[in-house]
């Protein structure tokens, strides 16, 4: 019997998190992708504190987005989370794709964050 896609994603994320850790100097940019929206957080794992966050549900983006589950929304979220992180003095991050494949919406978010000035 095959394993459902969500379980596969969770399994990949557990494997990935063994090697990734956000520090105060270089926090973790975590991405969560649902069927309807996309979410991104910049997290300091040492202090267990979220430093910056953005999603396709943000008031800043909601009016300009027709759909929260496409590459355009991911690009907008990537730019917004990068802008918020840079405003707090964060230049470098560790990218945590959340067990999702680096393709499509996750890739669009990562590339937009890089273009906006985050280094990873």
Curated annotation (Swiss-Prot):
Pfam families: Ribosomal_L18p. Coiled coil: none annotated. The keyword Ribonucleoprotein applies. Signal peptide: none annotated. Gene3D superfamilies: 3.30.420.100. Residues 1-25 are annotated as: Disordered. Keywords: Ribonucleoprotein, Ribosomal protein, RNA-binding, rRNA-binding. One of its GO terms (molecular function) is structural constituent of ribosome. Residues 1-10 have a biased composition (Basic and acidic residues). GO terms for biological process: translation. Part of the 50S ribosomal subunit; part of the 5S rRNA/L5/L18/L25 subcomplex. Contacts the 5S and 23S rRNAs. Belongs to the universal ribosomal protein uL18 family. This is one of the proteins that bind and probably mediate the attachment of the 5S RNA into the large ribosomal subunit, where it forms part of the central protuberance. This is Large ribosomal subunit protein uL18.
């Amino acid at each position: 019997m095959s394993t459902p896609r969500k379980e596969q994603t969770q399994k990949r994320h557990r494997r990935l998190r063994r090697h990734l850790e956000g520090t105060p100097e270089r926090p973790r940019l975590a991405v969560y992708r649902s069927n309807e929206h996309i979410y991104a957080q910049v997290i300091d794992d040492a202090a267990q504190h979220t430093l910056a966050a953005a999603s396709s549900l943000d008031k800043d983006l909601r009016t300009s987005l027709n759909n929260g589950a496409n590459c355009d929304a991911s690009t907008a979220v990537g730019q917004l989370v990068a802008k918020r992180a840079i405003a707090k003095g964060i230049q470098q991050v560790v990218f945590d794709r959340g067990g999702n494949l680096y393709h499509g919406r996750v890739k669009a978010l990562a590339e937009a964050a890089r273009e906006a000035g985050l280094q990873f």
